[in-house]
From Swiss-Prot:
This is Ribose-phosphate pyrophosphokinase. The lineage of its organism: Archaea, Methanobacteriati, Thermoplasmatota, Thermoplasmata, Thermoplasmatales. It is found in: Cytoplasm. The gene is prs. Pathway: Metabolic intermediate biosynthesis; 5-phospho-alpha-D-ribose 1-diphosphate biosynthesis; 5-phospho-alpha-D-ribose 1-diphosphate from D-ribose 5-phosphate (route I): step 1/1. The active site is at 184. The keyword Metal-binding applies. Involved in the biosynthesis of the central metabolite phospho-alpha-D-ribosyl-1-pyrophosphate (PRPP) via the transfer of pyrophosphoryl group from ATP to 1-hydroxyl of ribose-5-phosphate (Rib-5-P). D-ribose 5-phosphate binds at residues 186, 210, 214-218. One of its GO terms (biological process) is 5-phosphoribose 1-diphosphate biosynthetic process. The keyword ATP-binding applies. NCBIfam families: PRK00934.1 (NF002095), ribP_PPkin (TIGR01251). Its EC number is 2.7.6.1.
Length: 286
């Protein structure tokens, strides 16, 4: 096997390569004077199962992935497998208004035209999986989160909305804790009311878990409500930590700690999904 490490996932790819007792492959990469990306893979990839590890969140990451897929066509590889820990554009999985693109569809069609399989971790919407021409696997970070918090004293695991209830129910069961979700009620097209259900959290230690922290609004509001109800300690965790516009500062006004996975590298990426990804790679490379 060969592990190709793209810029967005260097640390995770290095840890995966170390676990699998190999060295990550990196391209000769630079920018043309006009800003366009140049890359080249000069290591012989012939006969190997290739695993490209890199996110597809920013436009630059998308281009790096597409150019990598094109570049390695020169080698007679055994297989080409994309592992995008954070699969970008999955929020645009359908057309909401006329004239809009279905972004996740066109990108997935491109990726799957040049690969034998695709995998990601906790994709935002599973509709995107159906756009692939090859097998598209959605790995899950629940066990990684459980590994991190198994020795942390918490009383409840909390979902900031009912959409994440299945995730929180699984994590809480594995931790041997109770769980609940923050209730939401839409008042009008601009106003959503959030409230804590009939659960006594006074003096309790809570772990809030979500799939994505982007602007942090929902997590910040949830933390504030729980603090008002007397929670003594609030941990915040998520699979993907994007932290748009410094949203961690907003969250930490009421939360005590933030710990997210390393699907997106940040100073809060204390939880690793490398075991989940390694198991997936071993199944293909067996």
């Amino acid at each position: 096997m060969k592990i190709i490490a793209l810029r967005s996932s260097l640390k995770l790819a290095a840890r995966i390569a170390e676990e699998l007792k190999t060295e990550p492959v990196m391209p000769d990469e630079r920018r043309f004077p006009d800003g366009e990306l140049y890359l080249r893979y000069d290591e012989d990839l012939t006969g190997h199962n290739i695993f490209i590890i890199g996110n597809t969140h920013s436009d630059a990451e998308v281009m790096e992935m597409i150019l990598t897929l094109s570049a390695i066509q020169d080698y007679r590889t055994k297989s080409v497998n994309i592992i995008a820990p954070y699969y970008g554009y999955a929020r645009q999985h359908q057309r909401y208004k006329n004239g809009e693109p279905i972004s996740s569809q066109i990108l997935t069609e491109i990726y799957s035209s040049y690969s034998n399989s695709i995998a990601t971790v906790d994709i935002h919407d599973e509709k995107t999986l159906s756009y692939s021409k090859v097998k598209f696997s959605d790995l899950h970070a629940n066990d990684a989160i459980v590994r991190y918090y198994k020795n942390v004293d918490v009383d409840y695991v909390v979902s900031p909305d009912d959409g994440g209830l299945a995730r929180v129910a699984d994590i809480s069961a594995k931790l041997g804790k109770k769980h609940f979700f923050i209730e939401k009620k839409r008042i009008d097209d601009r106003t959503v009311e959030m409230k804590v259900p009939n659960v006594d959290v006074n003096g309790k230690k809570l772990l809030i878990v979500d799939d994505i922290i982007s602007t942090g609004g929902t997590i910040a509001k949830s933390s504030g409500l729980l603090r008002e109800k007397g929670a003594s300690k609030i941990y915040v965790s998520a699979v993907h930590g994007l932290f748009v516009n410094g949203s961690e500062n907003k969250i930490l006004q009421n939360a005590d700690e933030i710990h997210v996975t390393d699907t997106v590298e940040s100073k809060f990426s204390d939880i690793s999904v490398y075991q989940e990804v390694c198991n997936y790679i071993r199944d293909i490379d067996a």
